[in-house]
Amino acid sequence: LSQLEAASDLPDAAWMAGMMRLKQEAFAQARGHLQSALAAGDRLGALFAKYDLSPQSTLPIAKGIFAHISPTERGTRLALVELCEARGDAEGAAQHLERLMVIAPEDPIVLLSFVQIALDTPHDHDLLDRVIALTAATQNDTPIDTGILLYRARALAARGLPDAAIDVLTRAGRRRKDRPDRLFHQIRHDRAELYARVGRKAQARREFEKLYAEAPEFDGLAERLGLR
């Protein structure tokens, strides 16, 4: 790491140093390195390409879903979104995501990151409507799709459409293969909460009990079931 930082005038070295500092949660240093790499434009990744290297780093996106990123504008901005989110910088995260939606509008990882951050402000109706529109065509073919559907359901619920949200969560929960347990448990919890919201108390109770059988440590669940 020290050698990379000593050579951080090279965009690829700055990128590697930034990713390593991000994993160490040294956010100020990580941000400096990653912004330097991003500012290099087309020079980012050139040294790796010269020596036929394809470095990747793993980045958490949402609910147990991870992305593999490389030294490109997309990868660097996704890393900066994660960094901004960790620092509570919602405005910074939003700026990077808006750019990502321009350069990679069809990228499901970008969409998942966007909708997750958008749902941090559930009272912004225009933003919620944008989430609903952007996710309208999402199927349930991959774990990333399933994550997107979770946030689509949350947007629908926040707009006062709980039954539509329940339908989305039911579809999202039908495929469990390759889905992180954390994601599946959150889907079940959100659906149970919505059942309770629309007065389907027995169904809500059944969902909460099923969730407890699988994940008794789920935050607040034991209290919800009256077990504590």
Task: Name every feature range the model reports, one short phrase each.
Residues 1-4, 29-37, 91-99, 125-139, ...:
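Alpha-helical repeat scaffolds
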Residues 205-206, 210-228:
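Terminal, low-structured helical/coil segments at or just beyond the last alpha-helical repeat
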